[in-house]
């Protein structure tokens, strides 16, 4: 029997003391993965917050940009035109654009359909003709368009007068810069 004690146990099963599946390495990997995912989530939230904040700041500065910030008068005129074209017309200015009946002969326009809604004009239908380019549209279509933009949807010509240069201004200095032609 003494020999049996000194001999290696050949009869012992190989899986008598199995290592647990979730060993130290697996726990270490899971902890690292959680930390990495949490860091990525925080970075994503920070990037989205920064993006939103910058968009708000840009939107506010675009609204309140004044001509005093631009030193060159020609750049001021171009910037004002772009700014005004991006903001749209006020309802009072919109009412100044003439409305006529299609097919009455009074309106000088060659189009047979509204290029905003792609609907055909019918005789007796109210049509608004833009003064600078003579493009005509259904009244409700062009009113919706002009409340958000102040340019013709067909040719993109601005409906606003550009601000005169400081040298061209006479004694009569008006606050109203934007007017409908």
Curated annotation (Swiss-Prot):
Transmembrane ranges, per UniProt, are 34-54
Which terms are listed as keywords in the entry? Membrane, Metal-binding, Transferase, Transmembrane, Transmembrane helix, Ubl conjugation pathway, Zinc, Zinc-finger
Q: Which InterPro entries match?
A: ATL10/ATL72-79-like (IPR044602), Znf_RING (IPR001841), Znf_RING/FYVE/PHD (IPR013083)
Tell me which EC number(s) this protein carries: 2.3.2.27
Looking up CDD domains in the UniProt record yields: RING-H2_EL5-like
Gene Ontology cellular-component terms for this entry are: membrane
Give the matching Pfam families. Answer: zf-RING_2
Query: Which cellular compartments is it found in?
Result: Membrane
Q: How does it sit in the membrane?
A: Single-pass membrane protein
Q: Name one GO biological process term.
A: protein ubiquitination
Q: Which domain of life is it from?
A: Eukaryota
What is the main EC category here? transferase
Give one GO molecular function term. Answer: zinc ion binding
Reactions the enzyme catalyzes = S-ubiquitinyl-[E2 ubiquitin-conjugating enzyme]-L-cysteine + [acceptor protein]-L-lysine = [E2 ubiquitin-conjugating enzyme]-L-cysteine + N(6)-ubiquitinyl-[acceptor protein]-L-lysine
UniProt zinc finger (RING-type) residues: 114-156
Recorded metabolic or biological pathway in which this protein acts: Protein modification; protein ubiquitination
In the record's own words, the domains note is: The RING-type zinc finger domain mediates binding to an E2 ubiquitin-conjugating enzyme.
Q: Which family does it belong to?
A: Belongs to the RING-type zinc finger family. ATL subfamily.
Q: Please report the name of this protein according to its UniProt entry.
A: RING-H2 finger protein ATL72
UniProt lists the gene as: ATL72
């Amino acid at each position: 029997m003494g020999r049996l004690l000194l001999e290696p146990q050949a009869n012992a099963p190989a899986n008598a003391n199995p290592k647990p599946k979730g060993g130290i390495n697996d726990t270490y990997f899971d902890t690292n993965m959680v930390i990495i995912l949490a860091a990525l989530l925080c970075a994503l939230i920070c990037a989205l917050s920064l993006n939103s904040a910058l968009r708000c700041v840009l939107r506010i500065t675009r609204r309140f940009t004044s001509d005093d910030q631009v030193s060159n008068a020609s750049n001021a005129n171009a910037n004002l035109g772009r700014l005004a074209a991006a903001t749209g017309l006020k309802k009072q200015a919109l009412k100044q654009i003439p409305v006529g009946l299609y097919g009455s002969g009074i309106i000088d326009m060659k189009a047979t359909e509204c290029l905003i809604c792609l609907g055909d004009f019918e005789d007796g239908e109210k049509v608004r003709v833009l003064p600078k380019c003579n493009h005509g549209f259904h009244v409700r279509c062009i009113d919706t368009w002009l409340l958000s933009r102040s340019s013709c949807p067909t040719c993109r010509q601005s409906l606003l007068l550009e601000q005169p240069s400081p040298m061209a201004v006479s004694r009569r200095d008006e606050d109203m810069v934007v007017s409908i032609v």
